Amino acid sequence: MASSFLPSGATTGDSGGELSSGDDSGDVESLQSPKIEASRSLPELFEKAAEHLQGLVQVASREQLLYLYARYKQVKVGNCNTPKPSFFDFEGKQKWEAWKALGDSSPSQAMQEYIAVVKKLDPSWNPQSPEKKGKEANTGFGGPVVSSLYHEEIIREEDKDIFDYCRENNIDHITKVIKTKNMDVNMKDEEGRTLLHWACDRGHKELVTVLLQYRADINCQDNEGQTALHYAAACEFLDIVELLLQSGADPTLRDQDGCLPEEVTGCKAVTLMLQQHTTGKA
């Protein structure tokens, strides 16, 4: 469910360790921005580098792809301006953290660092040589890769299931399905997550309210023993935590690691609310 670095079927090779979320690119240790000749246009070189990278993905580590992704976003979008991905979207969070770590880095710096990594991957690369097209292109992935790394997976309407509509916060569709098809509001996905888990994870408060109105099991636990309250707490949605508590959520339920909802959050306000609620019920 996490958005991938690459199109379906692509691989990135051995990452050689944990992915880095900042300027430390793993295989790109202490890399300095290259000197760009005055006669060359930096944006033009950047676009050529992005195009050339299509044929280098198989030799790039995951750390390098993450490093490149962050700088591509910094150039094309600017400073990180999107919410942190959901609790269990591991790849999405790594990508977001890498981009976020660039802070106010200038597009110029990001372009130079991007070009430097492409040169590191292929020291023989000559920006003046035209890239191979069509069947000659050594992409191995059926099309451009890094130039569109940041695009989220698009699911065709006919391929969507009820959980996809939940992630999209499509309240009308979910309500219609529950009403007309007598769907079990507590049905689970392969990880044991219900619609309520998903709605809490994504911060869809109105949808949470609707699901509770249709008698969603507020204390249902997923395959790891986590309740919707664990998800809302971990994602630091204070308003949803409050709503769940007011609706009867049990803050004393532990997951398989023995953690209470108050122990999976980094938000002091959420922790305090959960502790106060537990104390008040004692």
UniProtKB/Swiss-Prot annotation:
It comes from Bos taurus (Bovine). One of its GO terms (cellular component) is cytoplasm. Keywords: ANK repeat, Cytoplasm, Lipid-binding, Phosphoprotein, Repeat. An acyl-CoA binds at Y69, A70, R71, Y72, K73, K95, Y114. The modification Phosphoserine is found at S41, S106. Residues 17-31 have a biased composition (Low complexity). ANK repeats lie at residues 191-220, 224-253. Monomer. This is Acyl-CoA-binding domain-containing protein 6. The keyword Transmembrane helix does not apply. Binds long-chain acyl-coenzyme A molecules with a strong preference for unsaturated C18:1-CoA, lower affinity for unsaturated C20:4-CoA, and very weak affinity for saturated C16:0-CoA. Does not bind fatty acids. Its main location: cytoplasm. SUPFAM superfamilies: Acyl-CoA binding protein (SSF47027), Ankyrin repeat (SSF48403). Residues 1-12 have a biased composition (Polar residues). PROSITE patterns: ACB_2, ANK_REP_REGION, ANK_REPEAT. It is found in: Cytoplasm. Signal peptide: none annotated. GO terms for molecular function: fatty-acyl-CoA binding. It holds the Pfam family Ank_2. Residues 1-34 are annotated as: Disordered. Residues 42-127 form the ACB domain.
